[in-house]
Amino acid sequence: MTKHPPNRRGISFEVGAQLEARDRLKNWYPAHIEDIDYEEGRVLIHFKRWNHRYDEWFCWDSPYLRPLEKIQLRKEGLHDEDGSSEFQINQQVLACWSDCRFYPARVTAVNKDGTYTVKFYDGVVQTVKHIHVKAFSKDQNIVGNARPKETDHKSLSSSPEKREKFKEQRKVTVNVKKDKVEKALKTEKRPKQPDKEGKLICSEKGKVSEKSLPKNEKEDKENISENEREYSGDAQVEKKPEKDLVKNPQENLKEPKRKRGRPPSITPTAVDSNSQTLQPITLELRRRKISKRSDTPLKRPRLDKNSPQEQSKKRSENSDKDLSRRRSSRLSTNGTREILDPDSIVPDLVHTVDTNPLPDKSPSAKDSAEGQLKSPLEAGQVSSALTCHPIGDGLGAADLELNCKSMGENTMKTEPVSPLAEVQEVSTVEVPNTLKKVDDSVTLNVPAVDLDHKFRCKVLDCLKFFRKAKLLHYHMKYFHGMEKSPEPEEGPGKTHVQTRGSAVPDKTSQESLTRKRVSASSPTAKEKEKTKEKKFKELVRVKPKKKKKKKKKTKPECPCSEDISDTSQEPSPPKTFAVTRCGSSHKPGVHMSPQLHGSDNGNHKGKLKTCEEDNLSESSSESFLWSDEEYGQDVDVTTNPDEELEGDDRYDFEVVRCICEVQEENDFMIQCEECQCWQHGVCMGLLEENVPEKYTCYVCQDPPGQRPGFKYWYDKEWLSRGHMHGLAFLDQNYSHQNARKIVATHQLLGDVQRVIQVLHGLQLKMSILQSREHPDLQLWCQPWKQHSGEGRAHPRHIHITDARSEESPSYRTLNGAVEKPSPLPRSVEESYITSEHCYQKPRAYYPAVEQRLVVETRGSALDAAVSPLCENGDDSLSPRLGWPIDQDRSRGDIDPKPSSPKVREYISKNVLPEETPARKLLDRGGEGLVSSQHQWQFNLLTHVESLQDEVTHRMDSIEKELDVLESWLDYTGELEPPEPLARLPQLKHCIKQLLTDLGKVQQIALCCST
C-alpha cells in the first residue's frame, strides 16, 4: 500500500532534497534524500562528504531528520550584511576559483540547493556555492567591509584614532576604484580588465601582507579580501608623510632617493589630499604598461616576521640556511603561479632600485630587500629580472643548484655573493637602463602572462588561455607535443649575465645553464630524477651467463636528488662521487659472492670487477647529462672482452618476481636461468653457501595454464648434454659417466621421429595420387627438383617450404639435442660416433665400408638426406610439439601407414599404366603430350619415388648407427649379458633399500619443516 509522506516544515520529500540527519553516533550532518520508499514510508539518507556505504534508511517522520532552515537563515543574514543579493541568470559576477581568488564570470544557472553554475571568461563552467559568488560592481565594498581575522601585532595598532583614519582612507580609495572601473570599461575592450582593476590594491600589498601570516601557512592561495585586510597593516608600518611622492610618472621614475617605492596611486596618506591627481597618473601608468605588452611578474615569497636587524644578522651568519630555505620555498616551473597586477610593475622597479645603501634605510625597505633575496629564480621564471632585485645573488643560487644537480666539472666555481654587497651594487644601476633590460627580458618569458591574468599559448594559430602556468605547460606538452623549449632555460640566464656581468663570470654561467638540471623543489622533477637513475642503473647491468644467478644486489645508497645535491656541495672531485655511485647503484654487476664461482670462473671475476669499476667511474660522471632520448638507447658501458660473445645474455631490464610479491631488491638475490627473473634468496630458502648449480624459479618449474608435459621443459639440458639428476653425495654419477651414450641415443630418437613425420607426408601425397580430381594435384604441374630452391606455386606450400629449409640445418636443436650440424662432410675422425666412442674399441671392428656408412649417417649424408626430408614433409609441425595427424585429414582419405615395399608395389600397380606413356612421351622429346593431369601425377610420382629412396637410405643409416652404439656398449661391458634375470634378486634388494632410504628422507623433511 502506497503511503504519502508527511507535511514537515522545511523538508520536501523528493529525491535530492536537502536536510540534516543524525547518525548513530548522535552527530548531525548535512544530507540529502537519495531514495524514497513509499510502501514502507521511509527515505534513504546520504550524508554529504561521506561514502555511500554510510547511507541509512530513516522513517520519514523520524525525529532524526530536521530541515536546514537555521543554516539557510544564517547564510541569508550574511548575504544581507555583505550587500549581495541573489543573482540572476546571465548576470556578471565575481566567482571564486580553486585558488581562492575571485574572477569575472557569468551566471548560467541558479540551482535549487542555493548554488550557481557560472561560466568564467576562459570558458570554464563550474558550480559554486552562493558564498563564493560576489557582485561584480560591488567588489571593493565587499573587500573593504571584511574584517581581518588575524593580523600581525607589529603591523596593526588597535587605537581607535587610527581605525577612524583608516576608514576615511578606505572610503576614498573605494570611490577612486569605482571611477577606475568605469573608465577602464570604456577605454579598454578586455573582458577581465575590471577584475584587474579590482585587484589593483592587493597586488602591491601582497608582499607586506604575506609578512603578517604565520610561517606554517605556506600556501600561495589567498583571497582578495585577505590581501585587502592586510592592507591596514601595511598602512601602519609606513606612517611617514609621503605627499611629496605624488608627481608625474616620469619624475617618479627619475627620482633616485625614494625611501619607500610605494605606488602613488595607493599611498594611503596621499589619497586624502590628492585623490584627483591619482586618477590620471594611474591611468597613464596602465596605458604605458598595456602598450608595452609586458608580462606580469610572479608573486614574491613571504617575508619573515623578524625585525630588520635580526634579519640582516641572520642573513650574514646562516647563509646555508638561506640557501636551503630558498630551495624549499621556490616555486617549480610547472607549479601554480600567482600574478601581480601590471600597475605594480613600475612601482616595484622604483622600489627596488634604491641608490641609498646607507644603514639609515627604513625598516620596511630592508624587509623588502630581504624578501627579494629570497625571490624565486627558476628556469622559465623572470621575476628577478622584472622586479630587478639583486641579480647576482639569484644567479649564484641558480649556479649552486645547477652544480648540485649536475655531475659535471666546475662544481663550486660560482660562490653566492653576499647580499649586502649586492644591494650596494644594484644601487648604482640607473633606472632607465633597468626598464630597458626589463623589457628585453619580458620578451623571453615563455609562460606568457596576459594582463587579464591568463597564460597564453605561444604557438601560432592557437588562441588558448590558461589561468595557471601548470595548465599551459600541460597544454604545450600534450596538445602540441612540445616539451619545455630552451627559451626558459637560456633566456633569463643571458639577461642576468648582461645585467650583472661583474657578479658572476660569463663562461661559468653559460656552462651551467646549458647543463641538464632538475629543480630540487619540484616533486615532478624528483620523480623524473629517480626514474632516470633507475633507467641508468638498468642500462649498465651486464649479465654473464655463467654468473647471472650468483650476484648480490643491494639498494642504491644515494638514489635521491637531495643526497646528490648534499654530496656535491662539497668541492670534492667528481670522479670520487662517481665511484661511490658505482659502488652503490651498480653493485649487481660488480659484487659477486666468491663461494658461488667455479674454478674456471675465479680469475674471470677479477677482470670483470676492475673493468666495470673503471668504466663506470668514467661513464656515470656524465649520467645526469643525458637527455631522455639518450636513455632509450642501449649504451654499452661495461663490456668485458671475455664476455662479448655472450650477447644474448645481456638484459637491459630486470624483473623481480618472487613468491613474496615484493618488487624490492634487497640482500642476496638469485636469478632464474630460464625467464631471467630475480627472486629473494631468503624467500626461496637459498643462501650464498647453498646455491644450486642450475637454478629454475617456481614459475618455470610449474608454469600456470600449460599442459602437464610442459612442466618439465625447463629441464632439457640432459637431452643435449646427457647430464641427468643424481644424488649429490655419490662420487660417480651414472649420467655423467654415460652422458655421451645418452646424447647419442637421443639423437637417434630424434632422427626416427623425423622419418615418421616424413612418412606421414608421404601418406598425404599418396592420397593425392589416388584421384585425378584432387585440387592439390595442380601444385605438381612442374617437376619438384626444378623448384626445390625457389618454393612452390601455392602460398601455403611456399610458407612451409621456407620453414622446412630453415629448420633443416638445426632440427636437432629443436629436439633439445645439439647445435647445428656442419653442412660439410666430416672425416672419419670428426664423426660423432667415431670421435667419442670408437676410440675405445679396435678400429677393425667394422669393415671400412660400414665405417663409411656410419660416417655418412652423421656427416654429409645426414644433412643431405634430412634436408629434403624436411622439405618434403611439408605438413609436419615443429618437432617440439610432435605431429598432429588429424590436422590435415581434410586433404583426403588416408590409408593405413604403408611400409616402403608396399608403397612401391602400390605405385607400380596403380600408377604404372599412366606413368609409362608419360615417360615414353618425354623420351621422344615431347611428341604429343598427354593431358595435364597425367603430367602432374607423373611429377608427383617421381617426387614420391625419390623421397621413398631417401627414406630407405636414411633408415639403413639409422640402423647401422644403432648397431655401432649397441656393439660399443657390449664391448665396454656396460650392458648385462643376455640373461638379465640372473641379477633379479640383487636388483630387488637395491630397490627395497632405495625405498627405505627415501622413506627416511621424507621423515627427516617432515621433522625439519615442523
Curated annotation (Swiss-Prot):
One of its GO terms (biological process) is positive regulation of DNA-templated transcription. Residues 267-280 have a biased composition (Polar residues). Residues 142-373, 483-609, 804-827, 877-902 are annotated as: Disordered. Keywords: Acetylation, Chromatin regulator, Disulfide bond, DNA-binding, Metal-binding, Nucleus, Phosphoprotein, Repeat, Transcription, Transcription regulation, Ubl conjugation, Zinc, Zinc-finger. Residues 147-246, 292-325, 483-493, 525-541, 886-902 have a biased composition (Basic and acidic residues). GO terms for cellular component: cytosol; histone acetyltransferase complex; MLL1 complex; NSL complex; nuclear membrane. Its main location: nucleus. Residues 542-554 have a biased composition (Basic residues). A zinc finger (C2H2-type) spans 455-485. Contributes to methyllysine-dependent p53/TP53 stabilization and up-regulation after DNA damage. Methyllysine-binding protein, component of the MOF histone acetyltransferase protein complex. Not required for maintaining the global histone H4 'Lys-16' acetylation (H4K16ac) levels or locus specific histone acetylation, but instead works downstream in transcriptional regulation of MOF target genes. As part of the NSL complex it may be involved in acetylation of nucleosomal histone H4 on several lysine residues. This is PHD finger protein 20.
